[in-house]
């Protein structure tokens, strides 16, 4: 059995035509040659196989399915599951998408058709291979079945009658496999027949059309292929790896292959399913949910599998074998690459990722008999190998019965290798000796020849021939002498060895006390006798299963070795082998059963036996050596005698020949003497050898005596071995008896234990019954007593009733309650004893937290998915708009109109890109939501039981030990459900109330609209007002008042507090006063002499004309400026939480059109006289600000009832906050003024802004401070006043100062004269940055997305240029800075907020931020130069602060701080484009970077984490970190003091200023602190050589003078 994980393959289908037309983007990416897929930008999944969009069908099959089909023929089950959302290509991948009218192409065949082809092709190959090998042809049986699971009913797709689903039952057979009863199983014989069955079944499958798929599968389909085969079983392998030959045996294998085509998961919202389709979708999702629960249980944490809910669904029951059972399983997860299906694709990948953790236990489905035969064969092979190892001595059994490798085996291996090594060495030495002997002979021959040649000889013709003959003769004699010497040396060494052996045997014999006699025994006969005894002993040993080797063969093999040294080594090896075999037999007996009593005796016998055997072996070896030595000496003696005789003969022959030749007598004598000397030497050697021979004979006699001793020892050895065998037999018998006794004792103990257990259970059952009986009796007794008491009380009551005294009624009433309380109290006591309330409370807390976590996760995911769906719908709408505009562009011939269409198309494409970015961002958020929630919960959760925290909710409920604990949890769960239901009902009630209120407001708005229509119609102002209202505003009047409520831009909340101090008389005009005024007060004439009187009811009969006018007037009355272009542009990003804008940017509007439409209404230009007169009756916006626009009294009621109502209701509005709605909507209420009702909402906003401005105006002045705050470093000298709201920014040059405020103004000041020079216009929103341009007469003011350049040389301070964040440059006269417009809370499309800006020290470059980048401007040419790239790490972040400086070399350096905590350095040139960061300062801050300051070779950075960091500009390393430099987050940094000795100044949100000494050391030293230097936070600071200026949220600027001046 082998564990194998479920294989998972991911297949991404190609995009469809509809998805491409809808503009869906690909949200998945696959790494090449790597099974990894990435979704959402950074969420990656790794599977066993990943197939991207262009993957063909055959690649999918060959990569992961083909090997499963091959395993089918080895008896292994297999399953292929196709999972995914509807329309993701599951049916196409599996190959069941058949069309009766279309023939399917070969390359389009799916997994199932290809598997069928592969199966029958493999069958043919197996039969052909068997025939080639001469084996029996295997027999195959193939059958198929095809079922579908429709609405949780199993239907047979191959059956003619598919209505009988109740007859199909799911069972589990004896082997644990799932089988279906009642399903038709058809036998197939070829591929075509199987394909026909598959096609017919696929056509019977339930399909239907949905919004996502024209042919959507409405059921789960399972096609099963059964294969049975009978083949020749393979023989087992031997040690060499070859198959053993033997009888042929057959084996039976059976396997099944499930092809599962799961129906796709559906969302009713997207599929549009209703009725039966909806029911089918619900059933499909329920089955897939149960499948997901099974996968989650099998692939749980730490590999622990608890209860697996297979029975929750028929689908999981059918797939029980495939998931966690006996099957090789492959899941093919099909998904869509389109971002419109992003959520479903992500869920599919998560689903498949969990399936990878499942482990199946796979075994071959083999017949029982063939399986048993295979197991026995493998067992026999293993036993044979083990037996061989025991025979060879590789394994032995120690005293404890454990198998160990014999030490003698390792020793034998070592000695064998050593002998081989010595043999090679001896061979090499012999070769070397032969070479040296030859060289020695040559040298001696040459020496003798030279000595002979030096003798004087008589000249003869044959002298040269004689010399050669003499030389050859000398050489022969020398060779013979050398050979004789070597033999002599060998004989001497042998004699020495024999002497040593003799001395050793003498010492041994003396120690044994053996006195050798002169008994004459024949050595050979004694050896033969010893051999016979050994043979008898061997047979005796074999009779008791003691293996051994043939001793005679051992002796014969030892006698054949020629070398004495090697003979001794091999004899020792053979001797050790023999001892090893004998010891092995004894140890095999010892292995079986052991006896401590006999073990000691056996050990002593074994030791003595070993010693005697070794002595016998040594004697035998000495006898053999003596025999060999004797033969050798005899041979050498004969050789020496022959050589002496030959030498004498040769001598005589040489002398005779010399005498015949008549040579020199002296020479002959010399030769004769030399030969005589040689002969003498040889005779001496011969005498020595004869002496040795005599001594050898003595040794032989001694060895015969020792041989007698050997015979005696052998007889003793035989006796000892017999004793050993008897002891072993006795030990075995004792062990058998002990084992039998132990088994009997174990059986008896088990029986006793079982009886004890049964008795204990019986006792426990009886005790329980007795306890129940006692409780029942007690309860019965109590009830009887209670009834008796009730009866007695009833009788007493009856008697009292008869007597007229109603006593005892209370007792009757209270007795049942008392009885119930007693019973409940007893039950509660039992419950308290049954479980621990504290442990249940802990478990309940864990359950509540997990429920809250799951609910929170689901809420977040649903919210993100809804946001993603909204962006997808918006993208679809933009795509439709682009297509429509392109169509009109191709059809139109008007050049101007075509240009407009091109502009609209470009704008729509830009909007499309923005929407696509938002879609990508939402996808990334959805991918990261699980990790973020998990991390959040880990940080916020209290410390609880770790074991409980790791369990799921289901596991916690399943782990209830007692019924009381379950009741406890259910009670709390019931209470929790009631609380949540009550809360939900309350929220629903509030929602309905709000909806009713909205509806009421809509009705009131409609009524007021009708009133306004009637009023304006009576004054004939419709045509005149429509004349100057822009056409696009007229077209935009298509939505209801409720849509206006939703689309209105938020207004500034801070502006509302300025109207709260008005206290005026409240009077609200009623509808009767407006509709049914009398003739005196309801006249609509503003001037009786100038204008004719018009009756309100005079035009009632003019229905058509009045209806048309009403429509036009309705447009005029409900067209807000904030929504004029809300439908043509997309929503821009909102202001960040750290910006100095406090109003929220909502929709997008074009304020130029608004201003153009508002201007005529304010100035009265472009309007007819009648309309101008009607508008002139509105309150003037140019009155004296000291008086206020509502201080002036209107004419009396005689002028008109309208003006009276307007006057009264206007004062009413001042007492409320409805004029400045915090939500910025255009909805009206009953308390809104008539002025607000009779004028457009954008006009009301303008008037409201003027109201706020006039009532908050302060006198602009610079006031000296008496007794100002004084310290060691600086002293407060002056205070600048003049702004109505907080001052956000300040900058100075030599004589001038500029300030920017929340009141949307910037002011230019003369700091020497202490006066205001000029107010620099009204800006769209807060002026959060102001900057002087060095070496020029320009000053910049920054508000929202605009940077305005002002020339302050002229008294008017003209606006020269307007630079937008997008890089657009406008002329200064393109905006009318003198006009007062409403506060702009929206930004146009493609524009972003300028959150940071700075001018370089040369005055040539301007740096402005836009999102995560910084744009660089050339101020000489007024055009953008380039940008600083990636100033923040994330493109969703933005630059929060910016500073520039110049190096001594003239390079310009820019330092940026971002909201994602990082600070970067850029080196900027005049002709640069995209500039990458030069350095990134690490480590980053822990929060948003609020200020950066380069100062004296260092960079100081501050952040919301209230820390200040000091970096070196040389290497970019941090030198110091000042922790908690302030109590609140730091908003500004600047340097103060003389150059080179500046102090670092920091200011924070609570108005505190701190001075730091940063030059004396690497650390920062606090010099002085000015707490509460301002009442509110300090937003900005700047300084000169001796002055410090602080801009605060208390609408003032503080002037501080250095005390060192």
Swiss-Prot record:
Keyword Disulfide bond: no
GO molecular function: ATP binding; ATP hydrolysis activity; microtubule binding; microtubule motor activity
GO biological process, one term: microtubule-based movement
Pfam families, alphabetized: KIF21A (PF23203), Kinesin (PF00225), WD40 (PF00400)
Species this protein is from: Caenorhabditis elegans
Per-repeat ranges for WD: 1282-1319, 1389-1427, 1525-1566, 1573-1605
InterPro entries: KIF21A/B_hel_2 (IPR056532), Kinesin-like_fam (IPR027640), Kinesin_motor_CS (IPR019821), Kinesin_motor_dom (IPR001752), Kinesin_motor_dom_sf (IPR036961), P-loop_NTPase (IPR027417), WD40/YVTN_repeat-like_dom_sf (IPR015943), WD40_repeat_CS (IPR019775)
Keyword field contains ATP-binding: yes
Chain intervals with Polar residues compositional bias: 550-559, 1116-1152
Location(s) in or outside the cell: Cytoplasm, Cytoskeleton
Kinesin motor domain ranges (all copies): 5-358
Function: Microtubule-binding motor protein which has ATPase activity. In complex with alpha and beta tubulins, preferentially binds to the growing microtubule plus-end to stabilize it and detaches following ATP hydrolysis. Negatively regulates axonal length through inhibiting microtubule polymerization at its plus-end.
Residues reported to bind Mg(2+): 91, 217
Residues passing through the membrane, by range: none
Bias (Low complexity) ranges: 1200-1232
Main subcellular location of this protein, as a coarse class: cytoplasm
Family: Belongs to the TRAFAC class myosin-kinesin ATPase superfamily. Kinesin family.
Cellular component GO terms, alphabetical: cytoplasm; kinesin complex; microtubule
EC numbers on record: 3.6.4.-
UniProt-recorded name of the protein: Kinesin-like protein klp-12
Keywords of this entry: ATP-binding, Coiled coil, Cytoplasm, Cytoskeleton, Hydrolase, Microtubule, Motor protein, Nucleotide-binding, Repeat, WD repeat
Signal peptide: none
Sequence positions that bind ATP: 84-91
């Amino acid at each position: 059995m082998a564990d194998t994980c479920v294989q998972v393959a991911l297949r991404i289908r190609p995009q469809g035509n509809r998805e491409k037309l809808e503009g869906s983007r690909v949200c998945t990416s696959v790494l090449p040659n790597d099974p990894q897929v990435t979704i959402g930008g950074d969420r990656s999944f790794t599977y066993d196989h990943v197939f991207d969009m262009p993957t063909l069908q055959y690649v999918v099959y060959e990569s992961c399915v083909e090997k499963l089909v091959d395993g089918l023929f080895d008896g292994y089950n297999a399953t292929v599951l196709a999972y995914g959302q509807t329309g993701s290509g599951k049916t196409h991948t599996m190959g069941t998408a058949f069309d009766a009218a279309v023939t399917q192409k070969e390359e389009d065949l799916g997994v199932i058709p290809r598997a069928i082809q592969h199966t029958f092709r493999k069958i043919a190959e197996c039969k052909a291979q068997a025939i080639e090998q001469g084996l029996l042809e295997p027999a195959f049986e193939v059958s198929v079945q095809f079922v579908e699971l429709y609405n949780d009913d199993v239907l047979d797709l191959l059956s003619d009658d598919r209505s009988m689903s109740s007859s199909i039952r799911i069972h589990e057979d004896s082997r644990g496999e799932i089988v279906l009863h009642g399903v038709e199983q058809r036998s197939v014989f070829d591929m075509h027949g199987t394909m026909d069955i598959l096609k017919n079944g696929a056509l019977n499958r339930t399909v239907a059309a949905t919004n996502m798929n024209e042919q959507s599968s409405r059921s789960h389909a399972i096609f099963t292929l059964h294969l049975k085969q009978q083949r020749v079983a393979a023989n087992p392998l031997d040690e060499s790896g070859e198959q053993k030959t033997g009888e042929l045996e057959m084996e039976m294998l059976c396997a099944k292959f499930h092809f599962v085509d799961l129906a796709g998961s559906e969302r009713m919202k997207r599929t549009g399913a209703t009725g039966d389709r909806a029911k089918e979708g619900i059933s499909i999702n329920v089955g897939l949910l149960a499948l997901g629960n099974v996968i989650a249980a099998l692939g749980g944490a730490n590999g622990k599998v608890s209860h697996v809910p297979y029975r929750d669904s028929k689908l999981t029951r059918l797939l029980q074998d495939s998931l966690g059972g006996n099957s090789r399983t492959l899941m093919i997860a099909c998904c869509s690459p389109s971002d419109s299906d992003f959520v479903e694709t992500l869920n599919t990948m998560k689903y498949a990722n969990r399936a990878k953790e499942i482990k199946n236990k796979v075994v071959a489905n083999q017949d029982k008999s063939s399986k048993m035969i295979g197991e026995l064969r493998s067992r026999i092979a293993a036993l044979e190998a083990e037996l061989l190892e025991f025979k060879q001595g590789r394994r032995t059994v120690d005293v404890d019965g454990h198998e160990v490798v014999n030490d003698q085996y390792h020793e034998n291996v070592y000695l064998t290798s050593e002998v081989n090594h010595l043999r090679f060495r001896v061979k090499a030495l012999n070769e070397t000796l032969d070479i040296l002997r030859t060289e020695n002979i040559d040298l001696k021959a040459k020496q003798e020849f030279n000595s002979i040649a030096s003798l004087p000889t008589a000249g003869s013709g044959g002298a040269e021939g004689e010399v050669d003959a003499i030389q050859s003769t000398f050489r022969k004699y020398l060779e013979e002498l050398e050979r004789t010497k070597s033999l002599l040396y060998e004989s001497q060494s042998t004699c020495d060895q024999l002497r040593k052996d003799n001395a050793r045997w003498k010492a041994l014999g003396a120690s044994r006390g053996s006195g050798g006699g002169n008994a004459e025994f024949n050595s050979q006969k004694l050896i033969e006798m010893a051999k016979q005894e050994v043979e008898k002993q061997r047979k005796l040993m074999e009779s008791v299963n003691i293996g051994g080797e043939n001793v005679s063969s051992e002796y014969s093999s030892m006698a054949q070795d020629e070398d004495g040294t090697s003979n001794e080594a091999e004899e020792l090896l053979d001797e050790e082998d023999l001892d090893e075999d004998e010891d092995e037999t004894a140890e095999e007996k010892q292995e079986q059963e052991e006896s401590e009593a006999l073990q000691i005796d056996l050990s002593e016998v074994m030791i003595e036996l070993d010693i005697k055997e070794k002595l016998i072996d040594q004697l035998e070896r000495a006898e053999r050596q003596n025999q060999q030595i004797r033969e050798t000496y005899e041979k050498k003696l004969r050789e020496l005698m022959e050589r002496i005789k030959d030498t004498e003969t040769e001598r005589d022959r040489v002398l005779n020949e010399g005498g015949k030749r008549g040579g020199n007598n002296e020479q002959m004598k010399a030769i004769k003497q030399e030969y005589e000397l040689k002969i003498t030497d040889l005779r001496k050697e011969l005498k020595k050898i004869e002496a040795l021979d005599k001594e050898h004979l003595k040794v032989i006699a001694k060895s015969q005596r020792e041989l007698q001793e050997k015979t005696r020892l052998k007889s003793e050895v035989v006796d000892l071995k017999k004793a050993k065998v008897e002891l072993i037999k006795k030990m075995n018998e004792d062990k058998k008896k002990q084992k039998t006794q132990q088994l009997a004792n174990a059986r008896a103990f088990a029986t006793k234990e079982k009886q004890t257990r049964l008795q204990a259970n019986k006792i426990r059952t009886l005790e329980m019954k007795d306890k129940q009986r006692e409780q029942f009796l007690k309860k019965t007794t109590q009830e009887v007593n209670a009834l008796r008491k009730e009866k007695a009380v009833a009788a007493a009551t009856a008697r009292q009733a008869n007597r007229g005294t109603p006593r005892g009624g209370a007792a009757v009433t209270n007795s049942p309650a008392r009885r119930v309380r007693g019973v409940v109290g007893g039950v509660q006591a039992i419950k308290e004893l049954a479980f621990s309330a504290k442990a249940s409370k802990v478990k309940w807390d864990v359950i509540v937290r997990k429920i809250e976590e799951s609910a929170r996760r689901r809420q977040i995911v649903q919210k993100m998915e809804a946001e993603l769906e909204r962006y997808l719908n918006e993208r679809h709408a933009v795509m439709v708009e682009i297509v429509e505009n392109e169509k009109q562009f191709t059809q139109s011939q008007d050049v101007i109109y075509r240009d407009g269409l091109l502009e609209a198309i470009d704008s729509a494409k830009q909007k499309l890109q923005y929407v696509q970015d938002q879609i990508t961002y939402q996808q990334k958020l959805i991918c990261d939501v699980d990790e973020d929630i998990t991390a959040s919960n880990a940080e916020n959760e209290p410390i609880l039981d770790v074991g409980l925290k790791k369990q799921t909710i289901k596991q916690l409920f399943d782990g209830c030990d007692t019924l009381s604990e379950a009741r406890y949890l259910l009670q709390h769960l019931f209470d929790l459900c009631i609380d949540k239901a009550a809360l939900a009902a309350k929220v629903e009630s509030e929602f309905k109330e709000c909806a009713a209120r909205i509806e009421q407001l809509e009705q009131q708005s409609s009524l007021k609209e009708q009133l306004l229509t009637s009023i304006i119609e009576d004054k004939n102002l419709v045509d005149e007002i429509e004349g100057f209202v822009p056409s696009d505003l007229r077209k935009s009047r298509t939505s209801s008042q409720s849509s206006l409520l939703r689309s209105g831009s938020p207004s500034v909340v801070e502006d509302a507090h300025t109207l709260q101090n008005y206290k005026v008389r409240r009077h609200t005009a009623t509808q009767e006063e407006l509709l049914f005024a009398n003739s005196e007060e309801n006249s609509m004439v503003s001037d009786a002499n100038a204008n004719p009187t018009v009756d309100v009811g005079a035009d009632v009969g003019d229905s058509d004309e009045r209806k048309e006018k009403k429509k036009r007037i309705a447009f005029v009355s409900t067209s807000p400026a904030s929504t004029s272009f809300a439908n043509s542009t997309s929503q821009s990003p909102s202001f960040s939480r750290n910006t100095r804008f406090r109003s929220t940017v909502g929709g997008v509007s074009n304020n130029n059109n608004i201003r153009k439409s508002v201007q005529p209404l304010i100035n009265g230009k472009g309007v007819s006289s009648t309309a101008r007169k009607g508008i002139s009756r509105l309150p003037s916006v140019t009155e004296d600000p000291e008086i206020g626009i509502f201080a002036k009294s209107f004419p009396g009621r005689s002028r008109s009832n309208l003006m009276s109502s307007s006057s009264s209701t206007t004062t009413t509005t001042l007492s409320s906050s409805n004029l400045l709605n915090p939500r910025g909507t255009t909805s009206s209420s009953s308390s809104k003024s008539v002025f607000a009702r009779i004028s457009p909402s954008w006009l009301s906003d303008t008037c409201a802004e003027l109201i706020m401005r006039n009532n908050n105006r302060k006198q602009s002045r610079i006031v000296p401070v008496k007794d100002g705050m004084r310290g060691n470093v600086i002293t407060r000298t002056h205070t600048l006043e003049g702004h109505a709201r907080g001052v956000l920014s300040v900058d100075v040059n030599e004589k001038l100062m500029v300030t920017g405020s929340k009141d949307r103004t910037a002011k230019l000041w003369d700091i020497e004269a202490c006066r205001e020079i000029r107010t620099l216009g009204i800006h769209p929103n807060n002026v959060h940055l102001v900057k002087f341009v060095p070496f020029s007469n320009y000053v910049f003011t920054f508000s929202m997305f605009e940077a305005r350049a002002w020339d302050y040389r002229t008294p008017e301070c003209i606006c020269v240029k307007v630079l937008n964040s997008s890089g657009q440059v406008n002329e200064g006269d393109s905006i009318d800075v003198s006009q007062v417009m409403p506060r702009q809370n929206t930004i146009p499309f493609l524009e972003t907020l300028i959150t940071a800006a700075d001018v370089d020290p040369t005055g040539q470059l301007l740096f402005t931020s836009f999102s995560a980048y910084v744009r660089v401007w050339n101020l000489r040419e007024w055009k953008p130069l380039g940008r600083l790239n990636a100033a923040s790490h994330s493109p969703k972040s933005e630059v929060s602060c910016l500073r520039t400086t110049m190096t001594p070399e003239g390079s310009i350096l820019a330092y940026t701080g971002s909201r994602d905590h990082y600070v970067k350095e850029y080196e900027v040139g005049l002709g640069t484009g995209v500039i990458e960061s030069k350095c990134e300062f690490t480590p980053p801050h822990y929060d948003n970077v609020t200020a950066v300051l380069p100062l004296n070779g260092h960079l100081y950075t501050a952040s919301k984490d209230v820390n200040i960091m000091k970096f070196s500009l040389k290497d970019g390393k941090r030198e110091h970190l000042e922790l908690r430099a302030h109590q609140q987050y730091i908003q500004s940094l600047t340097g103060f003091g003389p150059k080179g000795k500046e102090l670092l100044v920091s200011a924070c949100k609570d108005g505190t200023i701190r001075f730091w000494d940063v030059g004396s050391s690497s650390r920062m030293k606090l010099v002085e602190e000015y707490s509460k230097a301002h009442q509110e936070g300090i937003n900005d600071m700047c300084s000169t050589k001796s002055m410090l200026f602080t801009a605060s949220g208390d609408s003032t600027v503080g002037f501080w003078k250095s005390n060192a001046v």
